[in-house]
Amino acid sequence: MEHDFYQEDELLNSGLTNRGFLLSKVDEVISWARANSLWPMTFGLACCAVEMMQAAASRYDMDRFGMLFRPSPRQSDLMIVAGTLTNKMAPALRKVYDQMTEPKWVLSMGSCANGGGYYHFSYSVVRGCDRIVPVDVYVPGCPPTAEALIYGLMQLQKKIKRTTGFKYDSRQTH
């Protein structure tokens, strides 16, 4: 006769839930916390930056999703690239990305950041910020609305909850 671990878990959960306990895996708790406390850093390069600021204002209020803009890359875990990335700004983008702590994510906002946009064939424009840094979520539009940005951020939250796992390196010394 096989042992039914699922029934045991349900019995244990039902007994503890009514008493204020919650059973979960450490990985799930960490990924939930990471997804619901994103600290974005703005890398506003053009018109899309205005829409990004609007998403943080009182009408859309990104703070209610646990997102608080940080002024320093060392304090943030999400970079929002908003606008036209030129060849001259590309090294600065990479440098700022490298200063961010792990885990870090990148959201590309607008047609120009996604693929060069209207200026795609210009000699001075990088045809997508994904040529410089790895991008997790693309938000289309010229410029995308604040609702589109918030939708992209919610998609990133889902991705973080799905993929983030807790990794412990036993070689680290404190």
Swiss-Prot record:
InterPro entries documented for this protein: NADH_UbQ_OxRdtase-like_20kDa, NADH_UQ_OxRdtase_20Kd_su
Alphabetically list the UniProt keywords.
Answer: 4Fe-4S, Cell inner membrane, Cell membrane, Iron, Iron-sulfur, Membrane, Metal-binding, NAD, Quinone, Translocase, Transport, Ubiquinone
Q: What is its main location?
A: membrane
Q: What is one GO cellular-component annotation here?
A: respiratory chain complex I
Q: What is its EC number?
A: 7.1.1.-
Localization recorded for this chain is: Cell inner membrane
Q: Where are the transmembrane segments?
A: none
- Keyword presence, Cell inner membrane: yes
Principal EC category: translocase
The source's domain of life comes to: Bacteria
Cofactors per UniProt? [4Fe-4S] cluster
The protein's name is NADH-quinone oxidoreductase subunit B
Q: Which organism is it from?
A: Rickettsia prowazekii (strain Madrid E)
Organism ancestry = Bacteria, Pseudomonadati, Pseudomonadota, Alphaproteobacteria, Rickettsiales
